[in-house]
Structure formats: C-alpha cells, structure tokens
Amino acid sequence: MTAPNELPRNAFKRALREGQRQIGLWTSLGTGTSAEILAGAGFDWLLIDTEHSPTELPMVLDQLRGMEGGTATPIVRPAWNDAVIIKRLLDVGTQCLLVPYVQSAEEARRAVAATRYPPEGIRGVAVVHRANRYGRVKDYHTRANAEMCVLVQIETRRALAELEAIAAVEGVDGLFIGPSDLAGDLGFLGNNRHPDAVAVFADACARARKAGKPIGILAPVEEDARRYLEMGFSYVAVGSDIGVLRNAVEQLRQRFAAD
C-alpha cells in the first residue's frame, strides 16, 4: 500500500518494460464496487472504459478508489485524444491511459504531451488534487511524468501504415489493436475473428515487436486470447465485466431451466 505522501509506482509500466506478460479485463459497468471486486481477482490490469460506456469522471474516481489494494493496475480509456479530458483523468489519479483512434505519429505526440508537465508537455499544473495526495506528495510535479504510461490504439488502415512511426514516438509505452474498429475498417464489420482480420492483427504484432514496442489486444474468447498470447501480444484483455456477468447469469438460469 502506498503511503499518503508517496507517489505510486506504475507497476504496469515497469512490467511492460521488463517484458512480463500482462493479463487484464475490460470494465464498463462503471461502479466502484464492481471495480473493487474485479481488482481483487488477480488480474494484472483493468481497463476502465469511458469511450464506449456511460462512465463519467466521478465514476472513474469511484473505480480508482475501489481498486486500491487490489492486484490490478487501473488503465483508463478517455473518450477521445483530448488534452482537457486527459488532464482531468490524470488529476484524479490515473497513471495509465489507453488513447483511442490514434492515426499518426503527430497524434501520438499530442497524447503524450497531454500527460506531461512542462516543459515536456502541456498538462495543466494544479497544486492540490487527488493524484498528488492533495498536496502531500511534495515532489509530485517533478516525478509524475516518469510514472505516466501512454498506450495508443491502432484502429484503422491509416494507423497500420503509420505503425512504426507511432511506435517511435518518445513517451509511447505501448500499442493496442482495437480489433472491432480495425476489422470494420478492413471490411469485416462485426467480425473481428475473420481470418483475414486476424492475419492483419498478427502482422501488426510482429511489426510492433520488431520496433521494440509492447502491443496489446482485447480478446474475450479464450481461444483467441491464447492465440494472441502465443503470437507475442504483451498484454491481453481476456474478458469484460459485462460479458462475465451476462454469461454467468445466463448459465445459472439454464441450470434451473427445467425446474
């Protein structure tokens, strides 16, 4: 447990740098209670989604609080690559971001800049907020940049063409395949398991690894998740809170269907 006057160490960022495989879960339910339950299940990371869920900033804060003491590092996906949105997420204590729909090296640089205090970036400087333990972390402003982890999503053919350039941007800690969006852009809308789409994902993984950059993916089907791990994906979300809940409750009801 981090002391009240200490800046938390970013365990996920260090694990990626050390080449450790990281298994995660997608969360969209948006409650601190569900996040607390999930964070204690043994996963390495949890993705708090604000792009495709009704989760707003106070709900992110509740989930960050709920995850304290668990095994999982919180990663927050902002709704867009927007410095104002990102600034607010960082001030409530987010240290890992998954930035959606990054199309170029310039957009990746903008994402990184939004997470860095001057002169390295453009993050607004507040004296007291949750991220610096309400002013108790005295060296927060000089150390915060180093603990930020920026992951960017590759979701289009254009982004694929720019993959190496995006990977080379200083401050980008990892790439992430958005399988549904990328499959849709490739002509396989609604079918991210199409063999041709999977082949593109595999090629992107190989290119990222050649560039020396960790790459992740969402794969809620166990067969797919294991295949992507074998391909060399560094961090994989193997399910979602909604999927786990839906499947469990439907299976439970089915066991009593004949009663």
Task: Go through each PLM region and give its residues.
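Conserved N-terminal beta1-alpha1 strand-loop-helix module at the mouth
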Residues: 2-74, 78-81, 113, 150, ...
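Conserved anion-binding
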Residues: 84, 94-170, 181-184, 259
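N-terminal amphipathic alpha-helix/helix-capping segment at the start of soluble metabolic enzymes
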Residues: 1-28, 136-146, 202-210, 257
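Glycine-enriched alpha-helix->loop->beta-strand junction motifs that scaffold or abut catalytic
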Residues: 41-45, 91-96, 115-117, 169-174, ...
